[in-house]
């Protein structure tokens, strides 16, 4: 199970050891780290991180993960978690995302796969998740209406039921 950058990581893990993965869950993610139509480019995020600092960047980006932005119930959880990183680690994470491309590997993923996406996601657009769904042969896309990037926090009951039903 992987969310956002974690979704890239689980795709890579499946590439390296797919025979050890029974089922794969990718949510709020796509096949490319350098996300087209993201709320801002990765380079813009890196530049703003250097200028605005970690605290402001974590707050600003976490707002994009929720439909209700900083008024969302679990916004503070995400904003505070982002502020626990170092400036260097945050920049390295952005570079890693920018440079990762798993598109060519999707045809090799044979594992039963659940793809979850919030239709208000500003990081990963519909094309990204449609590509996952089309290129992974045994996949199913579930769209959460009225949710953004953090569907697991915006509609946790439905998210947990969806994951549980897929795993059982």
Task: Cite the ranges covered by each PLM segment.
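Flexible "cap/lid" loop of the alpha/beta hydrolase fold
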Residues: 11-16, 20-52, 56
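Short beta-strand immediately N-terminal to the catalytic nucleophile in serine-hydrolase-like folds
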Residues: 1-2, 27
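Catalytic active-site module of serine/aspartate enzymes centered on a nucleophile-bearing elbow/loop
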Residues: 139-168
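Conserved alpha/beta-hydrolase "acid-adjacent" motif
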Residues: 122-128
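Active-site-adjacent alpha-helix of alpha/beta-hydrolase-fold enzymes
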Residues: 130-139
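Short beta-strand/loop motif that positions the catalytic acidic residue
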Residues: 109, 115-117, 121
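Conserved alpha/beta-hydrolase catalytic His-Asp/Glu region
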Residues: 34-40, 51-108
């Amino acid at each position: 199970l992987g969310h956002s950058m974690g979704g890239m990581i689980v795709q890579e893990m499946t590439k390296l050891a797919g025979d050890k993965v029974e089922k794969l869950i990718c949510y709020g993610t796509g096949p490319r780290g350098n996300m087209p139509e993201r709320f801002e480019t990765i380079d813009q995020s890196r530049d703003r991180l250097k200028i605005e600092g970690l605290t402001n960047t974590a707050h600003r980006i976490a707002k994009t993960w929720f439909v209700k932005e900083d008024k969302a119930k679990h916004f503070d959880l995400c904003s505070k978690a982002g502020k626990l990183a170092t400036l260097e680690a945050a920049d390295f994470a952005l570079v890693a995302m920018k440079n990762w491309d798993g598109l060519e590997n999707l045809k090799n993923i044979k594992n039963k796969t659940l793809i979850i996406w919030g239709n208000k996601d500003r990081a990963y657009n519909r094309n990204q998740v449609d590509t996952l769904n089309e290129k992974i042969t045994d996949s199913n896309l579930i769209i959460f209406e009225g949710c953004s990037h953090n569907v697991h926090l915006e509609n946790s009951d439905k998210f947990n039921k969806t994951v549980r039903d897929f795993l059982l």
